[in-house]
């Protein structure tokens, strides 16, 4: 029993295929979605999207947006999305270190907010990689 998942960014279609289950991060916590889920529209936080296919799970880093669930279709519109398999681990770790350094030297409210968002995005990318490694081992 499957349903269609479509993940879209302003520039591309990241995913458009049948899945068995997903787990995504909303602004009020994580939710799991199976076939015949009740209709819902929700804001998405920066976080991990877990996608269950027949016999394996995939992980994707989402950079915030919205999800619409209904009629066995889920459409996710996000600022950006990356499959964990497409993320370079060394580059992600380096970006995390830079984001941490930028937060430490941020001055003023605006710089601090921007640095915090950059840090959350960097942590999410690293978390997607770690999640994938855990599932493989």
Swiss-Prot record:
Coiled coil: none annotated. It is a peripheral membrane protein. Transmembrane segments: none annotated. InterPro entries: ATP_synth_F1_dsu/esu (IPR001469), ATP_synth_F1_dsu/esu_N (IPR020546), ATP_synth_F1_esu_C (IPR020547), ATPsynth_dsu/esu_N (IPR036771). Pfam families: ATP-synt_DE, ATP-synt_DE_N. PANTHER family: ATP SYNTHASE DELTA/EPSILON CHAIN (PTHR13822), ATP SYNTHASE EPSILON CHAIN, CHLOROPLASTIC (PTHR13822:SF10). Belongs to the ATPase epsilon chain family. F-type ATPases have 2 components, CF(1) - the catalytic core - and CF(0) - the membrane proton channel. CF(1) has five subunits: alpha(3), beta(3), gamma(1), delta(1), epsilon(1). CF(0) has three main subunits: a, b and c. This is ATP synthase epsilon chain, chloroplastic. It comes from Pisum sativum.
